[in-house]
Amino acid sequence: MQIFVKTLTGKTIALEVESSDTIENVKAKIQDKEGIPPDQQRLIFAGKQLEDGRTLADYNIQKESTLHLVLRLRGGVMEPTLEALAKKYNWEKKVCRRCYARLPVRASNCRKKACGHCSNLRMKKKLR
């Protein structure tokens, strides 16, 4: 049977499949046609993300059905160099206990007039 896969760019791909094919097989066929690795593909049908181990029949996908292909988003990890930079500019600071002004680590007095340039400073609390 023939099914269609629609990408986010609007391109529609026709695939020849069987209802007993797994989602992994469909992703492999998409890789053959489009060159997108299966681990980056997410297939959506009827508002549900399709799981790799299941078959087309499990999701009641019939001939001429349309699946939607979206790419998996990666993220959540900060590079060590960026993390060090963030620490340098955001975390390693002193804070005035009276006016809460952020100050450099080497500061001994506050720079603000509002608190009278007091020397009552503390280190900024670390994020967890």
UniProtKB/Swiss-Prot annotation:
GO molecular-function terms, A-Z: structural constituent of ribosome
UniProt crosslink position (Glycyl lysine isopeptide (Lys-Gly) (interchain with G-Cter in ubiquitin)): 48
Gene: FUS1
Glycyl lysine isopeptide (Gly-Lys) (interchain with K-? in acceptor proteins) crosslink, residue number(s): 76
Pfam families per record: Ribosomal_L40e (PF01020), ubiquitin (PF00240)
Ubiquitin-like domain segment(s): 1-76
Keyword Transferase appears in the UniProt entry: no
Domain of life: Eukaryota
Record's GO cellular component terms: cytoplasm; nucleus; ribonucleoprotein complex; ribosome
Designated name of the protein: Ubiquitin-ribosomal protein eL40 fusion protein
InterPro entries referenced in this protein's UniProt entry, alphabetically: Ribosomal_eL40_dom, Ribosomal_eL40_sf, Ribosomal_zn-bd, Ubiquitin-like_dom, Ubiquitin-like_domsf, Ubiquitin_CS, Ubiquitin_dom, Ubiquitin_ubiquitin-like
Organism: Trypanosoma cruzi
GO-annotated biological processes: translation
